[in-house]
Amino acid sequence: MTTRAELELPDLGATRALGRRLAGLLRGGDVVALKGPLGIGKTELARALIRARAGAAIEVPSPSFTLVQDYPLESLLIRHIDLYRVEDPAELVELGLEVPGPDEVWLIEWPERAEPLLPDDRLELGLAPGPEPDARIVRLVAGPGWIDRLPTPGDERT
């Protein structure tokens, strides 16, 4: 993991906008790790990303109880994975979650529970409370495969 950046998002709308922006950057084989405490907005960010990539306001339930929700889209299978209830990384192997396929993108909530199995070349978004009740601070840590894709300040590529 190499590049680090920090963003301040003033409200839920900005969190969703970040998800929509990231949707256009995804490639097959990507892993996006969403970290942060309960209720911080990980699922909202993932939901906005999935809907933007789908190009429609599809239903995107939280995968808290199913562990995995699959979204087969035109060019990618997005797997929204919630590891909150996973106690041992070996459980992921039992679920068939070892390595994303070349046409898959994994969005993982609570990735800390599978740290040894995660690829080094991933995008991590750590969400934390901001200075106002609805604000969030997002810490991005990007692996080498993400460096050329992430916008720099003032860059409007996405």
Regions inferred by a protein language model and the residue ranges of each:
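Conserved lysine of the Walker
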Residues: 42
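Short phosphate-coordinating micro-motif centered on Lys-Gly-acidic
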Residues: 5, 88-158
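Hydrophobic anchor at the beta1->P-loop junction of P-loop NTPases
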Residues: 32-34
